[in-house]
């Protein structure tokens, strides 16, 4: 089968002929229709320090996808041939304390599809049936292929009550932009998103952000005054991993504010903890998606009218995969879809 593999321990990714994966008794075999390129895939492509420590070479990568079930393990129930599915990319152990308590998104033994095991940039993928999620008929393949990052946005945004609240999102990558759309859809008052990438800030405006602020040109506190805000942001969603962005968030949070952190800093990050203490802030770390409450909420949000389609900006056939990675690497894109049909 065709597959995109991290074939060498250097920058790049390669289109190869790989063996079709073998299925176990509790697995599904999925014929891939579309995949999306994640920021994680770009780290792997660029072969940065994290990738060098984490990714086995050679390995098929990728973890954002939609496809069709073409074979079912003999122990599997609840799926049939022809089901259209995406899937949770975090494979959990099932036996640690959190797994046994139903908090599988906090499994201490998580294995990542396309990170620690063979991924979805291929014509076929095998995953445990537990990890598959049936896609409703009224949700397109394009949208289903980005459910993984959309789930990060939904999990982060819905960590706290948003109705009537003022929300600050730091980092206008695709996940931050989708989070802005979610916040507006569920009833936040002002949703302000910050970045220095004007292309992505414009995408955020299209997706419903009240204000998309280029912090290299505008002062965040001036924007707050313009919006009539007198007490600070009620909810903060940190999506950038950039220390200066998090510092600005702590400066502008209201007393008693709540912060959800998804962005991963490049290293240790020092902050002024007195701001957290004296403001009485609550900080919550976010990793992945809740299984499977986040997935049901994703489908329901789209079915209730949330439109995240503007975040998909580029489409390529798999043979043109290099153009897709170039588009992602340029910073002048939203989500990039690769078609395997």
Curated annotation (Swiss-Prot):
Catalysed reaction equations from the record: L-threonine + NAD(+) = (2S)-2-amino-3-oxobutanoate + NADH + H(+)
Cofactor dependence: Zn(2+)
Residues engaged in binding Zn(2+) 2: 93, 96, 99, 107
GO cellular component assignments: cytoplasm
Cofactor binding notes: Binds 2 Zn(2+) ions per subunit.
UniProt organism field: Shewanella putrefaciens (strain CN-32 / ATCC BAA-453)
This protein's encoding gene: tdh
Family label: Belongs to the zinc-containing alcohol dehydrogenase family.
Binding annotation for NAD(+): 175, 195, 200, 262-264, 286-287
Assembly: Homotetramer.
Pathway: Amino-acid degradation; L-threonine degradation via oxydo-reductase pathway; glycine from L-threonine: step 1/2
Superkingdom per UniProt: Bacteria
Protein name: L-threonine 3-dehydrogenase
InterPro entries xref list: ADH-like_C (IPR013149), ADH-like_N (IPR013154), ADH_Zn_CS (IPR002328), GroES-like_sf (IPR011032), L-Threonine_3-DHase (IPR004627), NAD(P)-bd_dom_sf (IPR036291), PKS_ER (IPR020843), Zn_alcohol_dh (IPR050129)
UniProt-listed Enzyme Commission number(s): 1.1.1.103
Annotated positions for site Important for catalytic activity for the proton relay mechanism but does not participate directly in the coordination of zinc atom: 148
Main location: cytoplasm
Keyword ATP-binding among record annotations: no
């Amino acid at each position: 089968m065709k597959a995109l593999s991290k074939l060498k321990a250097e920058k790049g990714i390669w289109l190869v002929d790989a063996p079709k994966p073998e299925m176990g008794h509790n697995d599904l075999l999925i014929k891939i229709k579309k995949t999306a390129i994640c920021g994680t895939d770009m780290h792997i492509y660029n072969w940065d320090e994290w990738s060098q420590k984490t990714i086995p070479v050679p390995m098929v990568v990728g973890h954002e996808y939609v496809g069709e079930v073409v074979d079912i393990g003999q122990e599997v129930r609840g799926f049939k041939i022809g089901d259209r599915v995406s899937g949770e990319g975090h494979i959990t152990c099932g036996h640690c304390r959190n797994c046994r308590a139903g908090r599988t998104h906090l499994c201490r033994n998580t294995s990542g599809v396309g990170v620690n095991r063979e991924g979805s940039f291929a014509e076929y993928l095998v995953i445990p049936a537990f990890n598959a999620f049936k896609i409703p008929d009224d949700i397109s393949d394009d949208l289903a292929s980005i459910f993984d990052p959309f789930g990060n946005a939904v999990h982060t945004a819905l960590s706290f009550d948003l109705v009537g609240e003022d929300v600050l999102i730091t980092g206008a990558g695709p996940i931050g932009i989708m989070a802005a759309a979610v916040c507006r859809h569920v009833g936040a008052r002002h949703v302000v998103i910050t970045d220095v990438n004007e292309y992505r800030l414009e995408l955020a405006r299209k997706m419903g952000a009240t204000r998309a602020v280029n912090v290299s040109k505008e002062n965040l506190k001036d924007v707050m005054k313009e919006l009539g805000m007198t007490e600070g942001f009620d909810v903060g969603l940190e999506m950038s991993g950039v220390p200066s962005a998090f510092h600005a968030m702590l400066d502008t949070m209201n007393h008693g504010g709540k912060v959800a952190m998804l962005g991963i800093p490049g290293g240790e990050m020092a902050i002024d903890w007195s701001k957290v203490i004296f403001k009485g802030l609550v900080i919550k770390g976010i990793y992945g998606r809740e299984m499977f409450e986040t997935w049901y909420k994703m489908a329901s949000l789209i079915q209730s009218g949330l439109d995240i389609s503007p975040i998909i900006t580029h489409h390529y056939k798999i043979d043109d995969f290099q153009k897709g990675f170039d588009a992602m690497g340029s910073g002048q894109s939203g989500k990039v879809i690769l078609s395997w049909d």
